Amino acid sequence: MLIELEKANKFIDWLKNMLFLNAKVKTAGKRVVFRGQVYFCELGEGMGSEESKNRPCIILQNDLGNKNSNNTIVAPITNGGAIPTVCVAIPNNTYSYTDNSGNTTFLSGNILLSNIVTVSKARLGNFICNLSDNDILMEEINEKLIGSVGLYKTFKKLNDTITSDKKAITRLIETRNKLTRENEDLIKQIEKLKNNLPKEEK
């Protein structure tokens, strides 16, 4: 087995950083973050094609989980190659932030929903921006996230069932309204006939 010296040194450096972050776990666990927010996240040194280094990541975990857990679920944002079916592009020149050098820059790149990962909140650095107010972007994230974790067919089947049920309910309401109108018409006709009867026959 051949071990790359450069890679080994990177893992050693990451181990030092990991020990530092581990010391912050308890206090960082109290940090409240929200779904759709973007933070710098120390992903460390990855293996193979795993995303690594300190990079922007979007919070994907629901807010209840974010409140009660020391961990959260994130997806990395990168300017590298992206697969359209499981990636969402950040709108250009829209979300500005101050980088580590104090310069104002814009968030750019693609949200890699094929690389979602659970991380300790201790890995989270500075807040960058909030994407949750962009309904169109968040809807695209949700749709592609469903596809990334293999739930597209399940959700499509559920959605088709809901759509079918809504149509059936609409038809039932229309039928009920029609029968109600017919019943009201019959009552009016009966009252009219009763009023037309001779007094002694009433």
Predicted regions and their residues:
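Loop/turn positions that initiate beta-strands
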Residues: R35-V38
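Compact nucleic-acid interaction/catalytic patches
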Residues: S49-T98
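Regulatory nucleotide-sensing modules
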Residues: F40-E42
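C-terminal terminal-subdomain/extension
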Residues: M1-K10, I90-K202
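Short, charged beta-turn/beta-strand-edge "cap" motif at the junction between a beta-strand
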Residues: G44-G48
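A general structural signal for short secondary-structure junctions and capping/turn motifs
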Residues: K30-R31, L64-G65, S101-T104
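Compositionally biased, charged N-terminal/linker segments
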Residues: M1-V32
